Amino acid sequence: YNFDKKMINLLSSINKRAIYKNYPRRNYIDTNPIDDYAKKFENVKVIDGNYDFRYVNTLGDLFIISNVGQASTITWMINLGKPIIYLYTNKSDFLNTQAIDLVKKFFIFIDTDHYGWESDLKNILNKPYSELKKMWKDKQLYIDKYEEEWLTGKNLHAGKLGAKYIKELILQNTKK
């Protein structure tokens, strides 16, 4: 709740309109209080309800995510070709070092455990959209390089990737 509230305050202070869509949760019987809070700001539009991202993805020009665990949402976003800002924290994401390095290459990366991250994010969001697109285009080299293996591979799925990883690990550890 506090992180979402901080994000909404930050979004309300940038020089652009913002759309806020939280990840659907069933924590509340009534309206999610963070949605009600966000509606108080003139430049923040709240998407109510549990709409799947693919049905509302055309509304944004840039996306901010705080979890790479929603794989389908991530792949939808990447395929849109619009800038993605990833808010990383070691408090809830369980990414190994290799995954963190890849995420830094794929996305505009903000470490929310770092003092002053809010200012860093605000500075990025206040850039002209053409600069944001350039930042994103610079990431495309890495996305293209790793897309099939790590992101949106059309012939892969988690079971095959997991089996491939385990097989390689066993082979590496049994060679003498």
Task: For every predicted segment, state its role.
Residues 50-60:
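Short acidic alpha-helix that forms the nucleotide-activated donor recognition element
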Residues 1-36, 151:
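Conserved catalytic-core segment of nucleotide-activated headgroup transferases in glycan assembly
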Residues 58-69:
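Acidic donor-binding loop of glycosyltransferase active sites
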Residues 18, 46, 84-85:
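Hydrophobic beta-strand scaffold residues
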Residues 15, 59-61, 81:
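Short, well-ordered alpha-helix to beta-strand connector turns
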Residues 31-50:
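Nucleotide-activated donor-binding/catalytic signature segment of Leloir-type glycosyltransferases, i.e.
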Residues 35-36, 41, 67-154:
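Catalytic binding pocket for nucleotide-activated donors in carbohydrate/polymer assembly enzymes
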